[in-house]
Amino acid sequence: MSPSDVPINWKRNLTVTWLGCFLTGAAFSLVMPFLPLYVEQLGVTGHSALNMWSGLVFSITFLFSAIASPFWGGLADRKGRKIMLLRSALGMAIVMLLMGMAQNIWQFLILRALLGLLGGFIPNANALIATQVPRNKSGWALGTLSTGGVSGALLGPLAGGLLADHYGLRPVFFITASVLFICFLLTFFFIRENFQPVSKKEMLHVREVVASLKNPRLVLSLFVTTLIIQVATGSIAPILTLYVRELAGNVSNIAFISGMIASVPGVAALLSAPRLGKLGDRIGPEKILIVALIISVLLLIPMSFVQTPWQLALLRFLLGAADGALLPAVQTLLVYNSTNQIAGRIFSYNQSFRDIGNVTGPLMGAAISASYGFRAVFCVTAGVVLFNAIYSWNSLQRRRLATE
């Protein structure tokens, strides 16, 4: 029996890719709590300059990831997803190591851009699992996989803050590089993939990729949905701590309260994503998507009227439970509407839209709060999500009518 005939243990691959996504999510978020402090340590002084450079080094990673994702997705469809996971984990480990050695802000900015160019572990993990798991378990598997990155992103800032306090800022980058190298080793030794490389001549061009989709218009609407989900999430991030301070008044533990309120949606998503993914496998991911979007609107609006931090925390927990269903539902619908031959590119295009949302969301939130106040951010975000719910419902209805 040739290696390509050996059956794949997709459950083991799911477990290993979950660990990989967890480590990647943790590695990315380990450095987030002190990013402005490291920028300052590299010689940037003055309030406005520090704000500008902190924003640049944060956003440039997502911008370059959005540009590079389609290229890596195409390469994954030609060479296989496992090799892309290995490339991403090792590339990010090397870049993180170099970040700890940066001597000035320009070196650090270039390395942050390289991090975006070489990233892509999580979308490739999604593509790998999507092409191996039975279709009737796609929602559960992708929902479960999504909790890996969320778990890492939740624990990362806490661990990063503690490590920075004990060892200083630069050593955290070296620790992060070690975490990513462990991710590389796990992928190398434990993930299995049967993949027949495709020559460049045999690869479908973009126009052929679109033509091969069961419903190109629906797939585009799913990309837009991913973008809007990230815009909605990111729009609240810049103002959350300031809004909590406005609600709490003069309290000594504002950082702890803000951190807790920032993390509760992730905890709720951890609990809800696999369960709602499994429910989506039974009743259809399109129903889960629309209901979760409507619930998100109904939870965002009262956030602009809360009077205490604990009211905000409760609403954000419920919002996290609904949000935990959104991206897995989108990914499951992408699986249903594409073939394994183009899965790498479809998931990479989706990642590009997600990265664009990661950049534009905080910009939108900051602009609205500067002009109209913190509470207006939640109302505008609710309006954006409502538009997305209507747009998604119309796209799904058109698909249903087309198949009847």
UniProtKB/Swiss-Prot annotation:
The keyword Transport applies. It is found in: Cell inner membrane. The keyword Lipid biosynthesis does not apply. It is a multi-pass membrane protein. Its main location: membrane. One of its GO terms (molecular function) is transmembrane transporter activity. CDD domains: MFS_MdtG_MDR_like. PROSITE patterns: MFS. The chain crosses the membrane at residues 19-39, 56-76, 90-110, 113-133, 144-164, 171-191, 222-242, 254-274, 288-308, 317-337, 376-396. It holds the Pfam family Sugar_tr. GO terms for cellular component: plasma membrane. Keywords: Cell inner membrane, Cell membrane, Membrane, Transmembrane, Transmembrane helix, Transport. InterPro entries: MFS, MFS_dom, MFS_MdtG_subfamily, MFS_sugar_transport-like, MFS_trans_sf, Mutidrug-R_MdtG, Tet-R_TetA/multi-R_MdtG-like. Belongs to the major facilitator superfamily. DHA1 family. MdtG (TC 2.A.1.2.20) subfamily. This is Multidrug resistance protein MdtG.
